[in-house]
Amino acid sequence: AAWYYYFENMTQQAIADRLSISRMRVIKLLDAARQSGVIQFRLRSDSVGMMQQSRELMQKYHLNDVFIIPEAEQEGQLNESIARAGAMYVADRLSENACINVGYGDTLSRTLNHLATMVQNPVTCISLTGGVSYYLPNGRSNIFNARLYLMPAPLLASSHEMAAAMRAEASVSEIIRMAALSSFTLVGIGAMHETATIVRSGIITQNELFRLKMSGAVGDVLCHFVDENGELIPSDIEDRLISTPLEKLRALDNVVGLAAGAQKVEAIRAVLRG
């Protein structure tokens, strides 16, 4: 049980299913392994510092949990590391037949792919924005064993009139209402950078990104662009957006934000303030 849990990153329920024992029995086995010395923990000095930073962030921004991961050894691995950590955090806290809200972006895509290998029980996923079908675990959906409720709309409509009409559609508004039923909400935090998913995917142009930055935008959540205090920036993009409103996101329980990198520091700080 200890090997599966600590080295193969399996959840307690997955271990119970693999060994044909109860989850409570797995918990007792893991506890016995720790007390007997089979499993020993050593905290690196940098890990102690990260734990202290986590506590400080929790106190400052009134957060339930904060997990800071070590810096990735190789360039380009940071999003993958954040995604894996986010998936492990959620997997260990999901109940049977759980429901998860999912946001938009590259980190969310990676997180869902990792979650697909960690969760054995059926999971319901609800999209918080339009235009999400391309990054859900398409090829691994059988492994993920998920029931998907996707917002049947693009992320950005061609006009604010079209966006208003789409938001009024029952098939879209019902998905937005369903979000309140979820156990967890996973969202990415986007930076105002040319490599942001929303720019690379062609949703907005470089010129639109520049105008948003000139208007005071420092980042986005669910493609809602916010200023340094986490307040919404009015824009043509916002008028054409098909996405769960920020006020509804703030009202949800267990919202998990996933973000990493120096270029996202300002955006992360703004979202925490908002």
Task: Write out the residue ranges for each language-model feature.
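Conserved phosphate- and dinucleotide-binding cores of soluble alpha/beta proteins
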Residues: 2, 7-14, 20, 25-31, ...
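N-terminal active-site beta-alpha-beta segment that forms phosphate/nucleotide-binding
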Residues: 6, 10, 19, 28-31, ...
